[in-house]
Amino acid sequence: MRRIFTAALLLVAATFAAAADRPEGRSFATRSVTYARHGMVGAAHPLAVQVGLDVLKAGGSAVDAAIAVNAALGFLEPTANGLGGDLFAMVWDPETEKLYGLNASGRAPKSLTIDKVPARENGTIPVYSVYSWTIPGCADGWFELHGKFGRLPMKDLLGPVAELARDGAPVPQVIAGGWARSIHRFKDKPGFAEVFMPGGRAPKEGEVFANPALAQTLERLAAGGRDVFYRGEIAEQIVAFSDEVGGFFSMQDFANHTSEWVEPISTTYRGLTVWELPPNPQGLAALQMLNILEGFDVAAMGRDSTDFWHLMVEAKKLAYADRARYYADMQFAEVPVEELLSKDYAAERAKLIDMKRAARSVDPGNPMVDHGDTTFLVAADKDGMLVSLIQSNYTGFGSGHVVPAVGI
């Protein structure tokens, strides 16, 4: 049985496709499969990909490349990720022939108890507020990955990104569009305009954006290691900002932060084994969707058919209903992972799909009946090490609160 691991269903290309790669008269763009002998990087921005390729050319591992790419994306694509967010990764190590999983998500401040959170009609925590903050796990994730699989010093990984952030880079169309759409929500949040609205507005397509404060933060990380972020000057600056705006962070919260190496979970799909991280990340939903889809002749539908896309949407509705009901931090809750991944359970859920109409609402299933938000990147090196990494602010610019002194 062949094995793959993924954090999303994706197509990755390491180079721009030539015009001849795009067939005429098709409703979607296609690209030729790209082959490489010494490594490959896939990410959402070409400059980030270039940073990763430079690391591989310098003898770095796939993990080294992934760290550098993620750092670059935090500057180039702040509408999706950054040092203020969390990180999740899987690494295939060819030396041990083992798949490793890393959960580098942060926890809520210890002093933030539920009685301090304002009541909302829908029972959720206000996203664009200090009540949604968790300790940023990204930096610790970098150093955990580097300590286990890195080859080059961190200064060689973060230094070029710091230079890029200081000099600036043109903003691409899609990122500029997302940036502009976010302004109405974030323009009055503390620190946001100072860092992300140069000249009082979002940068337009093609305009150069720079973040010198982030550049300095990356240089301090490269020189001082993870402790400068969790026990040193960077933590002090973030906590001071938190105090100013009514947040709940403390130095002890930062000092207590740790990432966790976890065992990935998997399902099979038509002869392939697909891997994800267990909750609190939400990759389990992708595995549930695959289990549901396996009961349908997807190939016969054709990729452009209404049946194909209808099925994808309905399967996602079913998986997301379970996500809302069952997924949680497994340190504090029992998540029925095995039951949710049961093929029998998927078959029962699949029966709820009506190929003639869309479901207006979907209830979560009962997987126990028989038993009582983000950017993505991949990197591979010449030795066969593979990295799948997701890093996120949860949604767009996160809460919208920005610490000007550190640029995140």
PLM features per residue range, with description:
Residues 1-8:
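Bacterial N-terminal signal peptides that target proteins for export
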Residues 20-50, 62-224, 229-231, 236-281, ...:
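Noncatalytic scaffold domains of N-terminal-nucleophile
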Residues 112, 396-408:
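A short, polar/charged loop-to-alpha-helix boundary motif
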